[in-house]
Amino acid sequence: MEREKEQFRKLFIGGLSFETTEESLRNYYEQWGKLTDCVVMRDPASKRSRGFGFVTFSSMAEVDAAMAARPHSIDGRVVEPKRAVAREESGKPGAHVTVKKLFVGGIKEDTEEHHLRDYFEEYGKIDTIEIITDRQSGKKRGFGFVTFDDHDPVDKIVLQKYHTINGHNAEVRKALSRQEMQEVQSSRSGRGGNFGFGDSRGGGGNFGPGPGSNFRGGSDGYGSGRGFGDGYNGYGGGPGGGNFGGSPGYGGGRGGYGGGGPGYGNQGGGYGGGYDNYGGGNYGSGNYNDFGNYNQQPSNYGPMKSGNFGGSRNMGGPYGGGNYGPGGSGGSGGYGGRSRY
């Protein structure tokens, strides 16, 4: 039987004790299945643990079993497991943010709430489902939201970009509120924000501002709660330098969700009007703002220039050698925010 793609079988494990080794990490996670890979990420110079690692199971069902058994505690410390983000997604704004709300695009007129519920309830407990309609005509605007009681169903669903719902191709993404997008953009600008990617140009991984946030030799090690760092074998790394979303980016002034094009909406001008507090309060008016290009090419969702994944290109072996960070500088890049992963 052909094995499922690695991206569906890999977990990022944050918050590891510096005493945790590959052996103890493996011993802990093997209670849910066979591991095909296990690594604790270490500083290439000092060999000191960087406080996170990755485990890869032999099947997605084993990953599901492990995530269903949270919280996890290893060597006396509660760790934070999360489905690893694949390289091609890792640099997109919000890729590492933990949310319980899922955006669903490509909803057709004949798709009702029960279709979404029937499809998505297999992933986890659903709190709410919203299909957005035009306030005047009552027609569906082509998108909606599904909110779960936990972040893991969302993380699992977005591993697969397209889903067939009621016979139609739908695209899924994490739904980020305006505040969450501002935090992402704050981190992108190097101000640190809640994500603490910081500047990171001075090789070694400066995790955001303030004392104690230098991951290499910093006294509090876990990046002052500001994020984790680099990629491993193409997974989970932080954004490549200034290319956090790249250009056109997540609606960064260009186009946005449906911006001027037909998009998924049926009005030919984006999703129109404001909704909730999402995307800068501007799901439309010609753009879906902070969510990225949802134009005629659904794949242009928060694009990032290919190849600019931390400039590392996985040099120096399967774990990316020592060159993990933005622009190939050796900086750390960052893995999401304080407790958002």
UniProtKB/Swiss-Prot annotation:
Region of interest: Disordered: 181-341
Modified residues (N6-acetyllysine): K156, K161
Residue positions, PTM Asymmetric dimethylarginine: R191, R201, R254
Keyword set, alphabetical order: Acetylation, Isopeptide bond, Methylation, mRNA processing, mRNA splicing, mRNA transport, Nucleus, Phosphoprotein, Repeat, Ribonucleoprotein, RNA-binding, Secreted, Spliceosome, Transport, Ubl conjugation
GO process terms (BP): miRNA transport; mRNA export from nucleus; mRNA splicing, via spliceosome; mRNA transport; primary miRNA processing
Transport recorded as keyword: yes
Location of the region described as Nuclear targeting sequence in the Swiss-Prot/TrEMBL record: 296-335
Modified residues (N6,N6-dimethyllysine): K92
Modified residues (Omega-N-methylarginine): R26, R191, R201, R216, R226, R254, R313, R338
Residue numbers bearing the Phosphotyrosine modification: Y319, Y335
GO MF annotation, one: miRNA binding
Domain RRM: 9-92, 100-179
Placement of covalent cross-link Glycyl lysine isopeptide (Lys-Gly) (interchain with G-Cter in SUMO2): K10, K92, K100, K108, K125, K140, K156, K161, K174
The record's note on its domains: The disordered region, when incubated at high concentration, is able to polymerize into labile, amyloid-like fibers and form cross-beta polymerization structures, probably driving the formation of hydrogels. In contrast to irreversible, pathogenic amyloids, the fibers polymerized from LC regions disassemble upon dilution. A number of evidence suggests that formation of cross-beta structures by LC regions mediate the formation of RNA granules, liquid-like droplets, and hydrogels.
Assembly with partners or alone: Identified in the spliceosome C complex. Identified in a IGF2BP1-dependent mRNP granule complex containing untranslated mRNAs. Interacts with IGF2BP1. Interacts with C9orf72. Interacts with DGCR8. Interacts with TARDBP. Interacts with CKAP5. Interacts with PPIA/CYPA. Interacts (via C-terminus) with FAM76B; the interaction results in retention of HNRNPA2B1 in the nucleus and inhibition of the NF-kappa-B-mediated inflammatory pathway.
Protein name: Heterogeneous nuclear ribonucleoproteins A2/B1
Source organism per UniProt: Bos taurus
